[in-house]
Design a protein with these regions (language model features):
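Hydrophobic alpha-helical segments
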Residues: 2-313
């Protein structure tokens, strides 16, 4: 009598034994394992590539929107700068600018609406909504109370607004990944557009507005001349930064070289004309105060327009 009678003597399932039983040899097993691992790696790589591609698309879209946002804010900056300067001339006694002031008043409303439009779409993404709302409300409040302020106080108040606008331009460049471009030529180009040009136009705008006001009010005192000269020196230093940036960009990006050559040629020509005019005032070569204030302002405007030649409407 068998001792295991009535008992199931069939051995339990064993993975390795089963493989031996079906005679799957080691090379085949290794090949199957390699195929399995390779499939997993390919799947992971595809997922990574797709994710990177999607991020690049989003980053590119954000950068394009950042450029649009910055261009519209730059146009607003120019508008506020011109209004600040001409309003100062009017408060100092130059009545001939009143018609242009009315035009600028309407223009500011349109420029604000243009920024509103792009901020509604991208303000949350760029974290700019709150800053822009503050700037917009500040402009509205100042336009209502500007006549109650002393001319110098009104000029300073508008300068506070332009400082906030320039900060917004930099912030948008940062949040839209414009200023983090790893390419050297692209970095210098974005740095020029985001940092140097806004500061340069603001220094030129302050010099234009304050000097024209001094001339209109016949107040070219030694102290005022000293302040104008200091502003001119700061503008000159920023001009040198602009020239260096253009040189680097052209050297590393031949595609942009010809366009930048045209731009910097016009900009430097505008700078020379403004500098010559400024020196004439400092030397007292122009004596017709009222005509001189408008002439000086117009030369300053031509300079700023040449500086902003990279911003396409």
């Amino acid at each position: 009598m068998k001792q295991n009678a009535g008992k199931d003597t069939k051995p339990g399932f064993n993975f390795w034994t089963t493989f031996r039983d079906v005679r799957i040899r080691r090379p085949l097993f290794i090949m199957l394992t390699a195929i399995f691992v390779f499939t997993i790696l390919v799947t992971m790589l595809n997922s990574f590539v797709i994710t990177e591609w999607q991020q690049k698309i989003r980053r590119t879209a954000a950068q394009q929107a950042g450029v649009v946002y910055q261009v519209r804010v730059m146009h607003l900056l120019k508008g506020v700068q011109e209004y600040r300067g001409r309003y100062n001339m009017w408060r100092q006694g130059d009545e001939k600018v009143s018609a242009r002031l009315a035009e600028l008043d309407n223009s500011l409303s349109l420029l604000i609406s243009a920024v509103d439009e792009v901020d509604q779409e991208w303000g949350r993404k760029f974290g700019s909504a709150e800053s822009w709302r503050s700037i917009r409300e500040h402009i509205k409040a100042l336009r209502e109370e500007e006549d109650d302020l002393e001319p110098e106080a009104a000029f300073a108040a508008y300068t506070g607004i332009t400082a906030d606008i320039i900060s917004l331009i930099y912030s948008v460049g940062d949040k839209s990944d414009l200023i983090t471009d790893p390419e050297l030529s692209s970095y210098y180009l974005v740095n020029m557009i985001t940092n140097i040009l806004p500061d340069l136009s603001e220094e030129a705008g302050r010099l234009r507005g304050r000097t024209s006001g001094f001339i209109a009010g016949n107040s070219l005192s030694p102290a005022n001349k000293s302040a104008m000269t200091a502003s001119y020196i700061r503008m000159h230093q920023l001009q040198l930064k602009l020239n260096r940036s253009v040189t680097v960009i052209a050297a590393y990006n031949p595609v942009l070289a010809s366009a930048l050559e045209i731009y910097i040629s016009k900009e430097e020509n505008g700078y020379r004309q403004f500098s010559d005019f400024f020196e004439q005032y400092m030397q007292g070569d122009i004596t017709d105060i009222k005509v001189g204030s408008s002439s000086f302002f117009d030369r300053g405007t031509a300079l700023i327009e040449s500086q902003m030649g990279l911003y396409v409407a």
